[in-house]
Amino acid sequence: MEDFVIKEATFAKFMEDTVELFLAERRKEFRLTREADKELYCVYYGADKPKGTVIISHGFTETAEKYLEPIYYFVKHGYNVYQPEHCGHGRSYRLVEDLSLVYIDRYERYVTDLLAAAEAAKQAHPQIPLFLFGHSMGGGIAAAALSLRPELFAGAVLSSPMICPLTGDIPWSVAKPLAKLLCLLGKAKQYVPGGHAYDGKERFEDSASTSRERFAYYQKKRSTQPLFQMNAASCGWLNETARLNRYLMSKGWQRIETPLLIFQAQDDTFVSVAAQDRFAEKVKAAGKTSVKKLRVDNTKHEIFNSEDQVLQNYWKEILLFLQE
């Protein structure tokens, strides 16, 4: 497979001069409404001769704009792309006024919204297969969606999926009941301990990326758009990730019938790789589908924001999986 990954040295220029123009010609924005006054922002990019459709489920505090490079690769290789922005993110509806705070009342809302977007994509393109790509939080949401509608998807790529989050210096065994207690005390819509509003001070060295140019490209966009400045979790969000984890590990894995390609970062400080291992083994043991798991060297949590050679191998695996 040819070397098609955008080079780090000229990344920003190529994105601005080539990728953004290419995608703008193929871009359509629309909104889905499942509930009154709750609009889910979605964006669609059409391939010239589509052989499949990919729906992207983004991660915590992210937006569709963070995925322009992955979208470009999908579209250039013949896949339409649909990308909704999850509740509380970007241009989609929110349940709190603070633009920095990520809050969700029930994790099922994420899953139902994603499935609504997936159904819209399938209805628009019924003759070609639908695939799911989920990163981090979006990977956990994607896994739950797969368990509920296995017939909808031909395959799924889970990149550093959040089966269970990591909670820094506080062990998960402590953070989980603490989040539940804080919610019971009426603090569901408050920042988790240590969380704060967006201040624009995130450093590359502390980020989930190993590509400085890719990190800087999105941070520039984020710094000028308040709707892109989600920054920290609420107690309610953390409590719901615990509920999602419990569902995936107790029931969800039993219902997955879609072929899976799971990528794991070498140095992931945001989600538990051990939890990914347990989840993958459960799905594999159930015997209903294939599971391929790849640990990627020289990567942090955002594998899709890695250096050139890592990305070339990463995208080769993804495109081969979709073709199979």
Predicted feature residues:
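Alpha/beta-hydrolase active-site loop
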Residues: 102-122
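Catalytic active-site module of serine/aspartate enzymes centered on a nucleophile-bearing elbow/loop
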Residues: 290-324
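Alpha/beta-hydrolase-fold enzymes
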Residues: 142-227
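Short alpha-helix in the alpha/beta-hydrolase fold that links the catalytic acid
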Residues: 258, 272-282
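An N-terminal hydrophobic leader/cap segment in hydrolases
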Residues: 1-33, 40-45
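Active-site glycine-rich loops that stabilize anionic/oxyanionic intermediates
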Residues: 51, 59-62
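Conserved alpha/beta-hydrolase
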Residues: 64, 71-97
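Short beta-strand/loop motif that positions the catalytic acidic residue
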Residues: 256, 262-264, 268
